[in-house]
Amino acid sequence: MSQFVQSIIYENRTVTILDQTRLPEEEHYEIIHDLAQAIDAIKQLRVRGAPAISLFGGFVLVQEAFRTTGTLAEAKQELLEVSAQLLATRPTAVNLRNVLDELNQLIVSATTLKELPVRLEQKALELYQTDAKTSRQIGVHALELFESGDRVLTICNAGSIATAAYGTALAPFYLAKEQGIPLSVYASETRPLLQGARLTTWELQRAGIDVTLITDNMVAHTIKEKQITAIIVGADRITRNGDTANKIGTFQLALLARAFGIPFYVAAPLSTFDFTSLSGDEIEIEERDAREVTQLAGKATAPAGVPVFNPAFDVTPHDLITAIITELGVIEHPDVETIKRTIGQHTH
């Protein structure tokens, strides 16, 4: 896996992250010393990507568990409070909730203070390895949908630095590279924080994958002029009926895919599904600081005091999605029934 940059490292009971806000200018690794720093790292997007946030949150909980003192009951209460604080950092992505739910069960069921952090550590490491395998399997299924020479458009960053390895939407491009299959990627810059420009092009170029950067308002023209054959995106939350929350701008890509008659794919692990929500109407959409829109590199790009609407995500209705690609396979024409048939017992 030498082609991948590790965005989360857990060694010697310490969590270290690649500060993604400094890319592409600098590869800076930040050691996480305490919970407040970890929460700030999530909120300020130094660590980002739904799977990566969940893995990071798990390791932070482990790190805190090894530092607990007092009785078993006190340690349990303290760690459940830590878990709740981590969960509150990013309301839209569901992966973090799913990971913390698993770890919370271990906290509640622990019978000795000594075993508590050890069991949490084992589970967090297991989840990290599972995510790497899951991402690769998503890539395997996604690659089957593409042909040699395809030109595929994506938004934001659903790559290796947003997961343990490979990524979700970018996984097929890594596998195509490994197998010598030529695919071209067009990366939409992804305003206002430029994850497509700063992160996706950085990691794909680093891996030797053919990638071209475009601005967000070039998408329709690019689909037409460059004969884009498909669009693939990641996801932060998928409801029971297949409605998908992802980076703001995804919904309009789905509409353009429908207009041009090209497939629109969502690539995501089972941990991104929220089976407690029937539709996208139930998803809480995070709104972020206005300065992300009114400033660039600390300089004003809009007049002071102008009202700003800055949602971080939008919801793409399931009927605009050609297929959802998971580690279990491809869910074509996603809705409640097709998702249930593919995922089966995982819906319960």
Swiss-Prot record:
GO terms of molecular function: S-methyl-5-thioribose-1-phosphate isomerase activity
Catalytic activity: 5-(methylsulfanyl)-alpha-D-ribose 1-phosphate = 5-(methylsulfanyl)-D-ribulose 1-phosphate
A biological process term (GO) from this entry: L-methionine salvage from methylthioadenosine
Domain of life per record: Bacteria
Pathway per the UniProt entry: Amino-acid biosynthesis; L-methionine biosynthesis via salvage pathway; L-methionine from S-methyl-5-thio-alpha-D-ribose 1-phosphate: step 1/6
Residue(s) at site: Transition state stabilizer: C156
Record-listed E.C. numbers: 5.3.1.23
Catalytic center residues: D236
Pfam families given in the database record: IF-2B
Record-listed substrate binding positions: R48, G49, A50, R90, Q195, N246, K247
InterPro entries referenced in this protein's UniProt entry, alphabetically: IF-2B-related, IF-M1Pi, IF_2B-like_C, Initiation_fac_2B_a/b/d, M1Pi_N, NagB/RpiA_transferase-like
Keywords attached to this entry: Amino-acid biosynthesis, Isomerase, Methionine biosynthesis
Role, per record: Catalyzes the interconversion of methylthioribose-1-phosphate (MTR-1-P) into methylthioribulose-1-phosphate (MTRu-1-P).
UniProt family annotation: Belongs to the eIF-2B alpha/beta/delta subunits family. MtnA subfamily.
Protein name: Methylthioribose-1-phosphate isomerase
Organism: Exiguobacterium sibiricum (strain DSM 17290 / CCUG 55495 / CIP 109462 / JCM 13490 / 255-15)
Organism placement in taxonomy: Bacteria, Bacillati, Bacillota, Bacilli, Bacillales
Gene, per the UniProt record: mtnA
